[in-house]
UniProtKB/Swiss-Prot annotation:
The gene is hslO. Pfam families: HSP33 (PF01430). GO terms for cellular component: cytoplasm. This is 33 kDa chaperonin. Disulfide bonds join 236-238, 269-272. Redox regulated molecular chaperone. Protects both thermally unfolding and oxidatively damaged proteins from irreversible aggregation. Plays an important role in the bacterial defense system toward oxidative stress. It comes from Lactobacillus delbrueckii subsp. bulgaricus (strain ATCC 11842 / DSM 20081 / BCRC 10696 / JCM 1002 / NBRC 13953 / NCIMB 11778 / NCTC 12712 / WDCM 00102 / Lb 14). GO terms for molecular function: protein folding chaperone; unfolded protein binding. Keywords: Chaperone, Cytoplasm, Disulfide bond, Redox-active center, Stress response, Zinc. NCBIfam families: PRK00114.1.
Length: 293
């Protein structure tokens, strides 16, 4: 498997780490949405970050949605990941490319802007739970770190990186989520923080062939233990049946307008771009069902 996430623990079992290589899934998203460089970086980092949160927190049939509601040119980013580590997402504006920063990297901070980061968890309870924090950086990894500290009170460090080639294809995509467990000493936390600061630029390292296992050893040390290795992928579960169900929630007058004026309907999935066409007869059947005919 090319795209996968690993869960690891350090030798003293007081640091938990998830690392991910997600080049292919980010490339799939880029192709589906035809995103340009800045949009790809925002979407790619959001996909990776949401998968890391899902890997750390979800089980069973649970799912988690990240909403990055910035006022930058890319607009909002919406990403949903499930406990099986499938993910889907989109940004409001696909065709955004910005002048590079002085160091040559994509200006993700400018692309995102100011606003709010929301994380909604559907844990199978009566109501989903949403945590919200202001966007403090716009680089996304720092914003997720802030969210985990403020909303969930978990000392964490997040790193995310997406390398976009000059032709807008994806060259590399990966990242990590480190969490301190109860009992972790200040000395250990400082030592680990120093290791993270000494890491090579993530996208360059992934381009050079670094694996999630390599990254885990760089952060936790060679004596860390790999607990799990799971495939991650881009997958949208949309279907014509689901969209028919959505049409059933419309007012009868709206359906009648689609039949009489548009002579059908075409619905496009935000997450994957798939198009679903409904004929006049199909819309009439939905309307009849709604009216109890």
């Amino acid at each position: 498997m090319n795209d996968y996430l690993i869960k690891a623990i350090n030798a003293s079992k007081d640091l938990r780490l998830l690392t991910i290589n997600g080049k292919d899934l980010v490339a799939e998203a880029q192709k589906r949405h035809d995103t340009w460089s800045a949009s790809s970086a925002v979407l790619g980092r959001s996909l990776l970050g949401t998968l890391l949160l899902a890997g750390a927190e979800l089980k069973g049939d649970q799912e988690l949605t990240l909403r990055l509601l910035g006022d930058g040119p890319v607009g909002a980013a919406v990403v949903t990941a499930k406990s099986d580590l499938t993910v889907k997402g989109y940004v409001q504006n696909n065709h955004v490319a910005l002048p590079a920063r002085e160091d040559g990297h994509i200006d993700v901070k400018k692309a995102v802007g100011k606003g709010w980061l929301q994380v909604t968890k559907d844990l199978g309870l009566k109501q989903p739970y949403t945590g919200e924090v202001p966007i403090v950086s716009g680089e996304i990894a720092e914003d997720l770190t802030y969210y985990l500290a403020k909303s969930e009170q978990i000392p964490s460090a997040v790193g995310l990186s997406v390398f976009v080639n000059p032709n807008d294809t994806i060259g590399a995509a990966g990242g990590f989520l480190l969490q301190a467990l109860p009992g972790a000493s200040e000395e250990l936390l400082q030592e680990t923080e120093d290791r993270i600061k000494a890491l090579p630029q993530l996208s360059s390292a992934f381009l050079d062939g670094m694996t999630p296992e390599d990254l885990a050893k760089k952060i936790l040390g060679d004596d860390c233990k790999i607990l799990e290795k799971d495939e991650v992928s881009y997958h949208c579960d949309c279907s014509k049946e689901k969209y028919a169900g959505m049409l059933e929630t419309l007012k009868g007058s709206q359906l009648k307008e689609m039949i009489d004026e548009d002579h059908g309907a075409e619905l496009v999935c935000n997450f994957c771009g798939n198009k679903y066409n409904f004929t006049e007869a199909e819309l009439q059947a939905i309307l009849d069902k709604k009216l109890g005919k």
